[in-house]
């Protein structure tokens, strides 16, 4: 599943969003035609399992170089300069402890590796814990399907 840009064009000032228009972002017209499936964006920290290895997302902001060994997720954003990458989670790095905890808490009984895919890390170690969880977890992207309106006014 590929995340699309904002459906309607954003207005920027100094690389910051200051508004939104009723114009459809070029390349997203298919959404208004009824194609595709909308899913809930879970609020946490993006991560992935790639070939059995656990990664967290790293955003090389405009002018910053990604860490050695980072895997690009996509091309750099031409407007903001942000360039997302995957960097391996290091179980020995204290900065990664919440990711390690989330991964381990999400394994099914007897499982040693999560399936390949992208996930959102949620819980007390992520984004202020908006879901009030007592433990960290990773949840697969695209699990909660919704059917919102497909116009600017919803």
What do these predicted regions represent?
Residues 1-154:
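Core nucleotide-handling region used for phosphoryl-transfer chemistry
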């Amino acid at each position: 599943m590929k995340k699309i840009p904002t459906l309607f064009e954003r207005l920027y000032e100094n690389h910051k969003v200051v508004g939104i228009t009723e114009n459809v972002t070029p390349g997203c017209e298919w959404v208004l035609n009824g194609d595709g499936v909308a899913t809930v964006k879970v609020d946490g920290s993006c991560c992935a399992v790639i070939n059995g290895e656990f990664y967290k997302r790293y955003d090389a902001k405009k002018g910053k170089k990604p860490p050695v060994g980072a895997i690009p997720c996509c091309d750099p954003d031409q407007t903001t300069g942000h360039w997302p990458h995957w960097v391996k989670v290091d179980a020995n790095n204290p900065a990664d402890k919440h990711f390690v905890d989330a991964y381990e808490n999400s394994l099914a009984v007897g499982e040693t590796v999560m399936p390949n895919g992208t996930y959102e890390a949620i819980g007390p170690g992520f984004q202020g814990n908006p879901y009030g969880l007592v433990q960290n977890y990773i949840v697969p992207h695209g699990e909660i399907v919704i059917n919102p309106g497909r116009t600017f006014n919803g």
